[in-house]
Amino acid sequence: MTPPEAAVQNKPHYIKDDFVSGQDVRWCPGCGDYAILSVMQKTLADFTTTKRENHVFISGIGCSSRFPYYMNTYGFHTIHGRAPAIATGLKCVRPDLTVWVITGDGDGLSIGGNHLIHAMRRNIDLKIILVNNQRPAVNSKKNNPLLTTNH
């Protein structure tokens, strides 16, 4: 059995830049997604106890769904609203991975609402970040489910 001191020494040590990909971030100036990305990169660096490659970010369609491109981890940019379904499949096949779903209010609650509900019903170990920008950022013709007033 490995003594506790050895386990601490074998734990990977990361800094925020270890989770920053080389991709140019393509969000509008002032977008709140920048803050979410920065906090996630810093949080994973501070608290992860596993290899960086064991984190997977899965997204659908929308502004926030470009997230996997900006994380230096594995990731999928999937089809509109289906990220929870794909994440469920991945977690079932590879339960050792830390699987994150990043989705927006339109992607995750409009077209993907049923997939989100079923992922929660299945109660598997997914981590879901739902970004609520309260605007139809990608499709300006539709209101999303969390919009409090008509725009």
Question: Predicted regions: what is each one?
Answer:
Residues 26-30, 102-106, 151:
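Flexible, glycine/proline-enriched loop segments at strand-loop-helix junctions
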Residues 6, 40-58, 94-96, 113-124:
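Long, contiguous secondary-structure blocks with strong helical propensity
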